[in-house]
Regions:
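Carbohydrate transferase catalytic cores enriched for Leloir-type hexosyltransferases
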Residues: 1-333
Length: 333
């Protein structure tokens, strides 16, 4: 490590129970990346009292010796869709190839990504676990959203997420114009790595850009929207889908991949590369009125689907996963 960073960044901290001290590096993750860049291999950490389990929430070029290393992979978009991100696909593939062989277990957030990991890296299916993730709206958030500042007009079509090519923004804007709807299209989220053309495609079209708002205002915008329109080109999960469904808001999203999986048959699906298909579904949603059978079917189906991703459901999956770990590593846990 001393070869990777100035010695002044390596300090010693007093232990809580042993009375001794231990080396402390404040930016170990940066060091790991430098180590991987130079030596093309993972950085292994050694400790006198390693934890039983090290649960990495992101794929980093670092693992801990003498412990069960679990690495979370949220998506493989830089590898499966390299034109949609600025992340170096070769470096990520090299990193994941080493993590796949040296970590004990990989976890991910959808069955779509799990199958991609198995197929691309040839890993045994038993070593990749889909835990999904906690998503939705808490009881506290439901109370707070009623008094949150309004940032989007009621009855709009809303798209939540980074405004970038991967979210299919230009096709969405074009489809919204073609649909003939008079409802505004609200794009709520920060700028991405590129700059999609957001200019209106028709005289009647209204496109509203909201680059940032509080969590409470975001949820208020969702619950007051006519529908969520989310024709993303690639996702590992699709958080806005679950949030909208939890609030009883109809959802349009992309057919195939993680978006269709997370929607679980409770959304209207489109071909994300077909502008007319997106426009037709926007028009169909535009004509739906709250309280009608079609509307209620989407609303009720979405709320039921959102229950799969509640805190209680996630706790159940984690408990089952811990049981699975004890079965896999009976002598280490």
């Amino acid at each position: 490590l001393k070869a990777c960073l100035p010695a002044r960044l390596i300090s010693r901290r007093q232990g809580d129970t042993t009375g001794g001290s231990y080396p402390y590096i404040s930016d170990i993750y940066r060091v790991a990346h430098i180590h991987f860049q130079i030596w093309k291999r993972l950085l292994w950490l050694h400790g006198q009292q390693p934890p039983d389990i090290m649960f990495w929430t992101y794929p980093l070029p670092i693992l801990v010796k003498n412990t069960i290393n679990i690495v979370t992979v949220h998506d493989l978009i830089p590898i499966t869709h390299p034109h949609l991100t600025g992340i170096n696909p070769r470096r990520l593939q090299r990193l994941l190839s080493q993590l796949v062989t040296q970590a004990d277990i990989l976890v991910t957030v959808s069955e779509t990504v799990r199958q991609q990991i198995i197929e691309i890296f040839g890993i045994s299916a038993s070593r990749v676990v889909n835990l999904y993730q906690l998503a939705g709206v808490t009881a506290t958030e439901r109370r707070q959203l009623t008094t949150a500042p309004v940032v989007a007009p009621a009855g709009c079509f809303i798209c939540v997420g980074r405004v970038e090519r991967r979210k299919n923004i230009e096709r969405l804007v074009e489809a919204h114009a073609r649909s003939g709807t008079e409802r505004p299209l609200v794009l709520l989220g920060p700028d991405g790595d590129d700059m999609p053309d957001l200019s209106p495609r028709a005289p009647h079209q209204q496109v509203i850009r909201v680059p940032w708002c509080s969590r409470e205002s975001l949820l208020r915008s969702l619950v007051n929207a006519h529908a969520l329109v989310f024709p993303s080109l690639a996702e590992g999960f699709g958080l806005p889908i679950v949030e909208a469904m939890a609030l009883g808001v109809p959802v349009m999203t992309s057919r195939g991949g993680a978006t269709e999986e997370i929607a679980g048959g409770s959304a209207l699906l489109v071909d994300p590369y077909d502008v007319q298909d997106i426009a037709d579904v926007i028009g169909r949603l535009d004509r739906m009125q709250p309280g009608t059978p079609q509307w209620e079917a989407l609303r009720q189906g979405g709320m039921k689907r959102a229950e799969v991703f509640t805190e209680a459901a996630q706790i159940g999956r984690l408990r089952a996963f811990h049981t699975h770990l004890r079965e896999l590593f009976p002598n280490r846990l």
